[in-house]
């Protein structure tokens, strides 16, 4: 054998492979370059947008032969992921269609497929942006007006279906209405009568629909000075105003107008007949919302005028700002910079628009899209980027919110207090407190003094107590929180007369000497049980409150130095907690002692109860019962108590979600392994002459497959655990709502008997908390709506209470 020849052959082989790699690499580079060019079009450039578009279209046309599918995919994704550049991409597609009719047809088919897939997969925003883009292609002479009108008519038909949720019907009308600012003028000029018929059908629909959900979504309970309109009503008013103006708007950039002479010569495509997919029970539709208004033109200084509430420009500006927040909410600096760099920023009072939109997001009911701190951090970045204007606008907004706080929704009150305390902590807690001192003359339960008190309590979590003495005017002394110190009764004056004092002191010594949990139980065993009042009691008491009192208060007082010390103490003596807290009554007793010790430190209470839930020392139902107990009456309107209740509900919800996911994964693995075993047995029993499974092929099977394979018995046990968790979750909600009904009914009956007005501050706080539970946990509560309706929210309870439940059920009806 000629070795030289062999090496030469090898050289040819490796050379060929190298050329292939180089060719693949070049293709990848070209694809990435094309993608970058398409994504970046319309961004800062030294040349005009029109010349950029012409150049890019020429590049894309020359590369269609090699990268057709890639170009189709990118061009169909961009207007959905970057809806603010919709008209730029429609112009680009229009120019390509004018040069290459076949490509235009392929693109329309691709876009229609994207639209239909978005509807099937319940990606409602993507579907709406796809519909908008298809509509804008009419302006670029890519799609015919007749076929678009047919699509819009089909969507209105979907809105008039019977026996489907109203939220589905609402979305289809919203999608059509929100598209009209882009294509309304074109339809008006070419198909005026068809457009009018479409609008008449929409008006009939809007006049018939119910709005029971409206009140539960309002930020304020009154409409002065700004009405709080339901989103479809507001958009309809804006579209009617646009129609009065002959569909002429001043906000949407329309680069295709510069190419009208080219585009008008292009052949158009007809959309295929598109029918929205039928409703399925698994479909989740967007919930309704109320359009938030904080400012009007009188609030803004001299300069650009804020568009009116019913001008389409207001809708377009707000939608653009919302989409920027959605795109950049993970990075606050980028988000703030992009908000301040909005197109047409010189034609509007931008700072006022931004602040209004951010508070609209923060106060969105039933829950904001993102964490409260997300909006707070964006506002701080905005103040840093624009220190000459933004802090003043934000201060003005805060003043407006405080003045209107009397009628503010309870959930929004909490978010406002959380945001304001966080904001103050980033600006050295400076504020013109003297401007608000008139609130000191009001009742303590009134929202204004209550707001300041809650803000200071939240600030205390972010600072230290002495800071408040220096920071706050003396007139506010009654609202300043007490020092956050434990109240340990066994060292206070008069402690000698308490029955557990001697044992408490022994326990302190024992714990400091690093005793075991068994030693602690031994110290506690001789304490008398105050529940056994007589020697003749035949039934032994299920728990000893004195043991719990002495142990819990002593241990937590010793761990009071920090959260870490407290957690370490709870972990070390977990056995003692579990031994003493065998019943729900005993667990409530533990919670009572946590409250008694830490009554002046709300954050410590929240953190300890969270730890007790995580370590399963107390059950969620015990916390719910304790929150509504008589000893907590004085705390009932304080925010921290509801923080505890909501974290308890979330713990239960997370537990159910975790078990549900584990069961789903186990079933999937079981099915997968069953299929794998079946195919293996088929291969092993293959007839002679066919490929059998060799030992080498068997070895390629992942090692973990059999190890992770669950048995049917394990899956059954997991199903039982999940079923038990659902029962616990339902019981938790039943306890909470039953207690709400009891205390509210008692208040209403008492006021009626005494001839007093029931609408007190306490009543409004309590109804607000009931609404808050429904709203914050709407996804979980809706599963038990029928149970709640049949057992608790029956027709015989007071209409004021029943109305809250009906508003909740209307959210997804």
Swiss-Prot record:
The lineage of its organism: Eukaryota, Metazoa, Ecdysozoa, Arthropoda, Hexapoda. This is Nuclear cap-binding protein subunit 1. Its main location: nucleus. Component of the cap-binding complex (CBC), which binds cotranscriptionally to the 5'-cap of pre-mRNAs and is involved in various processes such as pre-mRNA splicing and RNA-mediated gene silencing (RNAi). The CBC complex is involved in miRNA-mediated RNA interference and is required for primary microRNAs (miRNAs) processing. Also involved in innate immunity via the short interfering RNAs (siRNAs) processing machinery by restricting the viral RNA production. PANTHER family: CAP BINDING PROTEIN, NUCLEAR CAP-BINDING PROTEIN SUBUNIT 1. It is found in: Nucleus. One of its GO terms (cellular component) is nuclear cap binding complex. Residues 667-716 are annotated as: Disordered. One of its GO terms (biological process) is RNA splicing. GO terms for molecular function: mRNA binding; RNA cap binding. It comes from Aedes aegypti (Yellowfever mosquito). Belongs to the NCBP1 family. Residues 702-716 have a biased composition (Basic and acidic residues). Residues 31-243 form the MIF4G domain. Keywords: mRNA capping, mRNA processing, mRNA splicing, Nucleus, RNA-mediated gene silencing. Component of the nuclear cap-binding complex (CBC), a heterodimer composed of Cbp80 and Cbp20 that interacts with m7GpppG-capped RNA.
């Amino acid at each position: 054998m000629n070795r030289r020849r062999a090496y030469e052959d090898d050289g040819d082989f490796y050379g060929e492979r190298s050329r292939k790699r180089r060719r693949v690499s070049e293709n990848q580079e070209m694809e990435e370059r094309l993608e970058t060019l398409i994504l970046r079009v319309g961004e800062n450039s030294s040349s005009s947008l029109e010349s950029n578009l012409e150049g890019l279209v020429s590049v894309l046309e020359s590369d269609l032969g090699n990268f057709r599918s890639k170009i189709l995919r990118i061009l169909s994704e961009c207007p959905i992921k970057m809806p603010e550049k919709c008209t730029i991409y429609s112009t680009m597609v229009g120019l390509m269609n004018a040069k290459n009719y076949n490509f235009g047809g392929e693109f329309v088919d691709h876009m229609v497929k994207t639209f239909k897939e978005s509807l099937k997969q319940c990606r409602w925003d993507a579907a709406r942006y796809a519909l908008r883009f298809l509509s804008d292609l009419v302006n670029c002479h890519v799609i015919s007006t007749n076929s678009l009108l047919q699509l819009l008519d089909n969507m209105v038909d979907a809105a008039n279906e019977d026996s489907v949720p109203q939220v589905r019907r609402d979305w289809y009308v919203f999608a059509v209405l929100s598209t009209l600012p882009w294509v309304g003028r074109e339809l008006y000029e070419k198909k005026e009568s068809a457009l009018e018929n479409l609008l008449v059908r929409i008006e009939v629909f809007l006049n018939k629909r119910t709005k029971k959900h409206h009140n539960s979504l309002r930020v304020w309970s009154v409409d002065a000075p700004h009405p709080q309109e339901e989103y479809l009503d507001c958009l309809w008013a804006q579209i009617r105003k646009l129609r009065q103006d002959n569909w002429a708007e001043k906000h949407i950039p329309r680069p295709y107008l510069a190419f009208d002479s080219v585009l008008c010569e292009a052949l158009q495509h007809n959309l295929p007949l598109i029918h929205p997919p039928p409703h399925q029970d698994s479909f989740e539709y967007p919930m309704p919302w109320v359009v938030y208004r904080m400012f009007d033109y009188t609030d803004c200084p001299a300069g650009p005028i804020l568009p009116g509430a019913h001008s389409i420009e207001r809708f377009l500006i707000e939608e653009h700002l919302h989409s920027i927040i959605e795109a950049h909410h993970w990075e606050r600096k980028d988000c703030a910079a992009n908000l301040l760099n909005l197109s047409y920023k010189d034609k509007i009072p931008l700072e006022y628009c931004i602040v209004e939109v951010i508070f609209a997001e923060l106060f969105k009911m039933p829950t904001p899209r993102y964490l409260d701190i997300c909006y707070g951090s964006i506002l701080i970045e905005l103040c840093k980027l624009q220190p000459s204007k933004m802090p003043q606008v934000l201060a003005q907004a805060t003043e407006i919110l405080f003045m209107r706080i009397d009628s503010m929704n309870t959930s929004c009150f909490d978010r406002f207090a959380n945001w304001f305390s966080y904001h103050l902590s980033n600006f050295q807690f400076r504020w013109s407190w003297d401007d608000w001192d008139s609130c000191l003359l009001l009742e303590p339960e009134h929202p204004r003094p209550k707001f300041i008190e809650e803000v200071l309590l939240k600030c205390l979590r972010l600072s230290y107590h002495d800071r408040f003495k220096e920071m706050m005017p003396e007139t506010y002394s009654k609202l300043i929180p007490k020092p956050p110190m434990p109240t340990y009764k066994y060292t206070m004056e008069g402690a000698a007369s308490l029955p557990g004092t001697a044992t408490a002191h022994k326990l302190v010594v024992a714990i400091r000497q690093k005793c075991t949990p068994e030693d602690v139980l031994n110290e506690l065993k001789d304490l008398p049980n105050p529940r056994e009042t007589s020697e003749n009691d035949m039934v032994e008491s299920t728990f000893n409150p004195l043991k719990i009192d002495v142990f819990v208060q002593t241990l937590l007082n010793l761990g009071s130095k920090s959260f870490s010390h407290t957690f370490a103490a709870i972990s070390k003596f977990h056995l003692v907690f579990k031994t003493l807290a065998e019943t729900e009554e005993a667990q409530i007793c533990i919670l009572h002692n946590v409250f008694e010790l830490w009554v002046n430190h709300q954050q410590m209470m929240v953190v300890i109860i969270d730890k007790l839930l995580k370590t399963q020392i107390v059950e969620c139902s015990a916390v719910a019962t304790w929150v509504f107990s008589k000893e907590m009456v004085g705390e009932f309107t304080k925010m921290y108590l509801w923080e505890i209740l909501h974290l308890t509900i979330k713990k239960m919800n997370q537990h159910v979600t975790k078990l549900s996911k584990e069961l789903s994964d186990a079933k999937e693995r079981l099915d997968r392994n069953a299929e794998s075993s079946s195919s293996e047995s088929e291969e092993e029993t293959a007839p002679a002459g066919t490929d059998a499974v060799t030992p080498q092929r068997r070895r390629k099977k992942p090692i973990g497959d059999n190890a992770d394979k669950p048995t049917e018995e394990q899956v059954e046990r997991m199903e039982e655990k999940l079923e038990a968790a659902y029962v616990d979750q339902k019981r938790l909600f039943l306890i909470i709502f039953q207690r709400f009904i009891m205390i509210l009914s008692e208040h209403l009956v008492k006021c009626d008997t005494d001839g007093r007005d029931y609408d007190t501050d306490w009543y409004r706080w309590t109804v607000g908390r009931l609404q808050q539970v429904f709203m914050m946990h709407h996804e979980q509560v809706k599963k038990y709506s029928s149970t709640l309706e049949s057992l608790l929210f029956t027709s015989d309870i007071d209409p004021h209470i029943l109305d809250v439940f009906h508003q909740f059920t209307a959210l997804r009806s």
